[in-house]
Swiss-Prot record:
Domain tr-type G stretches: 379-548
Protein family membership: Belongs to the TRAFAC class translation factor GTPase superfamily. Classic translation factor GTPase family. IF-2 subfamily.
Biased composition regions of type Pro residues, renumbered to the chain: 235-244
Keyword line: Cytoplasm, GTP-binding, Initiation factor, Nucleotide-binding, Protein biosynthesis
Function of the protein: One of the essential components for the initiation of protein synthesis. Protects formylmethionyl-tRNA from spontaneous hydrolysis and promotes its binding to the 30S ribosomal subunits. Also involved in the hydrolysis of GTP during the formation of the 70S ribosomal complex.
Species of provenance: Rhodopseudomonas palustris (strain ATCC BAA-98 / CGA009)
Composition bias, Basic and acidic residues: 113-184
Region listing for G3, in residue ranges: 436-439
Protein name, entry field: Translation initiation factor IF-2
Length: 883
């Protein structure tokens, strides 16, 4: 296109002749020669590089371009013709004049282009300067390499010269012919090899037409033999091959269409297989597979004790390395040895791992979560524990509230089991849970357990009896649990009832009732005549409203085992008070060292229920074994977690029992030493009871009976009937079997009768404790008491044949009896203790001599008596002791 740049003419014309561009390409044919006489011709195109500006390399192409008709000189004539005849170019466009904005934009673009050009020129100058510096550095490196090469060649030349001189010297000295032949052969070979080089060079000189010399040289170098270099004054030696850059893995395995590079390198003629390439890679790598691998850093979980093998496995290390580190610390171990957590942590940290310490007790974490009171929105029934002294009417009061008769079912009319019941208040209709506890001294643990799970304590005090020891203990339990107390003064229907005396006695123990100006509620009741029972329930309900008891029934159940027993028909049965959540049939539960799945829930009325909410007492069936009374019950998500917890607790229980047994029994030497020094005797017993609470009370009472001289040794204690294994155990230790509210089965009774094992049955704990106390008292060593009889003074010593020396004495006070024990005192020092063998008055043997009379005395096996000695006569009495 040609712009006339005439303001008046707005037409643009196109030249009629077509413009063409000649491709700047030079073609040639390259002939390639291969082994076995094969050859190949390849067409090679050489494309010229377009040069910008007036560069010098573009000058040779100028003649060719000049031969073509240039469109630039022809343009002015066309423009001149088009001006007078604008009608010929009918296809032209009418152009408008440029506006001011367009001119400004064009000027701005031109200015930007100039600035960009200046910047590019500066950048090119910087690049050229950097390239010049780089070439200078490379040139210096080449010169240094050349100097090193020349020094190396000089050194080799001197070595060869020294070797040749040594060979010449050896030939002169020994005159051998063979050493002379070898240099001749060497020189012949050198001479032959010397002209070989020009021939080879002559062969390589002609190159195919159009092929660059460099390409021909490369092709020739592949087929030629190694070149020999001959220096003046030295033998010919092969020249070192030129250093080539190391080929990258996979570079020799190029496939695809034919290009200039592939044609020159002849890669498409003979290619290496994949297996060959792999073998080459392995050879290049060498022993890279034996290099140390990257170290893995792990988080190692370390329990309280861990075996070395297990520690090595958790760290992914070799056990040998772990043992080596332990040896450096001065400890010799085997792979199966167990080390403590501190040592294991040192080893793991030294090997670069991170350590997470865990304890065996961590399995119990999260079992009893901290209760979030914000979720407790539903009201629950209060739990009321009835406490007081024995025979103050606790169970009778509860029977009157429940309209039941529990007292008649207890042996001896005293409560020996803990019971839980629910009563509906007649006034408000709300349910109240009552827990009945034993009152006598043996059941302290039961009372403490009842106080821990309760909200309110009802302290029952008999109006005719007043405050008693167990009443004081119940007050202390309630204060320790931090629960409010309601005093129920019972038996006000008796004629000798004194309620005011009870209130006054309670003041001594910091229990101040409302009538005395305090804040403790007191109610006068009569369980026998059912007086003021509704008022007692009303006070309990009022106290419960003040406490604002709330719960969340949707959370997993938690509770406390109040009582546990082994029922012959139903298996292990536990009385559980649910404290939080809801316990349902099918839940997996854990209590102490026992676990199980809830098979059935039985209410206090004997009815089977499907679930039990908060503050509801139920009997739970489904435990693997009877749990301990007082254990906390929890619902877990699966059997694996339950088994993990119970295994840990059972292990702890075994360790504790083993420690107590070993501490009590010790080794054989310790037992013998103990018998020699203290003479402590043991009374072996096997105790079986109906429920866990009674067993606990019996064991506590028997433990209190022990003294420094005699103690009860409990070989086995359990819940359930007496079995044949119990009899076998008793036979081995010659023990007595005690059954409390249980009986022996047929096989156990027959085995006991056959082996002579005594089995005693009891229904009242007092009788059991009294009998054991008497039996243990029989093991006590009796007490020896000395009773003075009289004194006698020796007047004269007589020698009598066939008898020996006889002392003539006068009894000064008391009496002297034959056969009694005597002491011989000389100068207020006892010189002999023995027995009186002879007592005569005149010539007759007498039984005793009274004060003021004279007699003759002789001692058993002692004759050194002198006149003036004092004889003291006394009698030793044996008195049986009791606990």
């Amino acid at each position: 296109m040609v712009d006339t740049k005439t303001p008046g003419d707005k037409t643009l014309t196109m030249p009629t002749k077509t413009l063409t561009l000649k491709p700047r390409v030079e073609q040639g044919v390259v002939r390639q020669s291969f082994s076995h006489g094969r050859s190949k011709q390849v067409v090679v195109e050489k494309r010229g590089k377009r040069r910008l500006g007036g560069d010098e390399p573009a000058a040779p192409a100028a003649p060719e371009v000049a031969k073509k008709p240039a469109p630039a000189p022809a343009a002015p004539p066309r423009q001149q013709q088009s001006r007078p005849a604008p009608q010929q170019s009918r296809s032209g466009m009418v152009l408008r004049t440029l506006t001011e904005d367009e001119r400004t934009a064009r000027a701005t673009a031109l200015a930007d282009a100039r600035v960009r050009e200046i910047e590019e020129r500066k950048q090119a100058e910087i690049e050229a300067q950097r390239r010049a510096e780089q070439e200078k550095i490379e040139k210096a490196e080449r010169e240094a390499a050349e100097a090193r090469r020349k020094a190396e060649e000089e050194r080799h030349r001197q070595e060869d010269e020294a070797k040749r001189k040594a060979e010449t010297e050896a030939k002169k000295r020994f005159g051998d012919a063979e050493p002379a032949k070898k240099p001749a052969e060497t020189s012949t070979t050198t001479t032959t090899a010397a002209p070989a080089r020009p021939a080879t060079t002559t062969t390589r000189t002609p190159t195919p037409a159009g092929r660059p010399p460099a390409v021909a040289a490369e092709a020739g170098d592949d087929d030629e033999a190694p070149r020999m270099i001959r220096r003046p004054g030295g033998p010919a030696r092969p020249a070192p091959p030129p250093k080539q850059p190391a080929a990258k893995p996979g570079a020799s395995k190029q496939r695809g269409r034919l290009t200039v590079v592939t044609a020159l390198n002849a890669d498409d003629v003979r290619e290496r297989s994949i297996a060959s390439f792999r073998r080459r890679t392995q050879r290049l790598k060498g022993h890279a597979s034996n290099e140390p691998k990257e170290k893995l850093v792990r988080e190692v979980v370390i329990p309280e004790v861990i075996a070395i093998q297990e520690l090595a496995n958790r760290m992914s290390e070799r056990a040998v390395d772990v043992i080596r580190l332990l040896m450096k610390q001065g400890a010799m171990h085997k792979i199966t040895d167990v080390i403590d957590a501190d040592t294991a942590q040192l080893i793991a940290e030294e090997l670069g791992h991170t350590v997470k310490r865990v304890a065996a007790s961590d399995v119990e974490e999260g079992l009893f979560d901290v209760v979030d009171d914000s979720t407790d929105t539903e009201p629950r029934s209060p739990v009321v524990t009835v406490m007081g002294h024995v025979d103050h009417g606790k169970t009778s009061l509860l029977d009157a509230l429940r309209h039941a008769n529990v007292v008649s079912g207890e042996a001896g009319g005293i409560t020996q089991h803990i019971g839980a019941y629910q009563v509906t208040s007649p006034e408000s209709g709300k349910k109240i849970t009552f827990i009945d506890t034993p009152g006598h001294a043996a059941f302290t643990a039961m009372r403490a357990r009842g106080a821990k799970v309760t909200d309110i304590v009802v302290l029952v005090v008999a109006a005719d009896d007043g405050v008693m020891p167990q009443t004081i203990e119940a007050i202390n339990h309630a204060k320790a649990a931090g629960v409010p107390i309601i005093v129920a003064i019972n038996k006000i229907d008796k004629p000798d009832a004194k309620p005011d005396r009870v209130r006054t006695d309670l003041l001594q123990h910091n229990v101040q009732v409302e009538s005395m100006g305090g804040d403790v509620v007191d109610v006068e009741v009569s369980a026998k005549n059912k007086i003021n029972l509704d008022k007692l329930l009303e006070m309990i309900a009022l106290q419960a409203e003040i406490l604002e008891l709330k719960t969340n029934t949707q959370r997993p159940a938690e509770g406390t085992v109040i009582e546990a027993k082994l029922d012959r028909g139903r298996g292990p049965v536990a009385t559980v008070l649910v404290q939080r959540g809801t316990l349902r049939v099918g839940d997996i539960i854990v209590a102490g060292a026992e676990m199980g799945r809830v098979r059935a829930l039985i209410s206090d009325q004997g009815e089977t229920v499907q679930e039990a909410g908060p503050s509801v007492p139920v009997e739970v069936l489904g435990f693997n074994g009877p749990p301990e009374a007082g254990d906390r019950l929890a619902v877990v998500e699966n059997e694996a977690r339950a088994r993990q917890i119970t295994d840990y607790r059972a292990h702890q229980k075994r360790e504790k029992s083993a420690a107590s047994v070993s501490g009590m029994r010790g080794s054989l030497e310790q037992m013998m030493t103990q018998l020699k020094t203290s003479g402590r005797k043991e009374f072996p017993l096997i105790v079986k009871a109906d429920v866990q609470g009674s067993l606990e009370a019996i064991l506590g009472s028997l433990e209190k009976l022990g003294t420094d001289e005699v103690a009860a040794r409990i070989l086995h204690a359990g819940v359930g009937g007496i079995s044949e294994s119990d009899v076998t155990l008793a036979e081995g230790f010659n023990a007595v079997i005690l059954g409390f509210s249980v009986r022996a089965n047929k096989e156990a009774a027959a085995a006991a009768k056959r082996n002579g094992i005594e089995i005693r049955y009891y229904n009242i704990i007092y009788d059991l404790v009294d009998d054991i106390k008497k039996a243990m008292s029989g093991l006590l060593a009796p007490t020896l008491r000395e009773t003075m009889l009289g004194n006698a003074q020796i007047l004269e010593i007589f020698n009598i044949s066939k008898v020996g020396k006889v002392a003539g004495c006068r009894v000064t006070d008391g009496t002297v009896e034959r056969g009694a024990n005597v002491r011989l005192i000389r100068d207020n020092v006892v010189v002999h203790e023995g027995k009186l063998s002879t007592l005569k008055r005149f010539k007759d043997e007498v039984k005793e001599v009274v004060a003021g009379q004279e007699c003759g005395m002789a001692f058993e096996n002692y004759t050194d008596m002198r006149a003036g000695d004092i004889i003291e006569c006394y009698r030793v009495e044996t008195i049986q002791r009791s606990l």
